[in-house]
Amino acid sequence: MADYILFMHDDAPTYDAGGWDVYLQTLKTNGAFEGGSEIGGGICLRKGVPAADITRHLVGYIRIAAGTMEEAKSLLAGNPHFEAGGTVEIRELPRT
C-alpha cells in the first residue's frame, strides 16, 4: 500500500460542497482516507534570496492510501471537485 496526495486545483466550476461529506465518508469506509484540508494563503521563504510567489492554484488536498496509481485514480469517483470538471493532481508520497 502506498500513500498518495490529491491536490485540487482552483479551476472547478461551482458545485455543491455538500458532496464532500459523502465522498470523504466513502474514502473512510474503504480505509483509504489519511487526511486532508482546504489550503489557505501563505508565504514562500528562501534563505538569503527572494523566494517565488506561493502556488495559488492549489485550494485543497486529500491524503489517501492505495495499492497503485490506478487504484488512486479510481478513488476520484465521487470527488465533488473532479466530478464538476476541476483538475485533481495525484502525486505519490514515497516512503523513505
Give residue spans per PLM region.
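Conserved, structured core segments of small domains
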Residues: 1-96
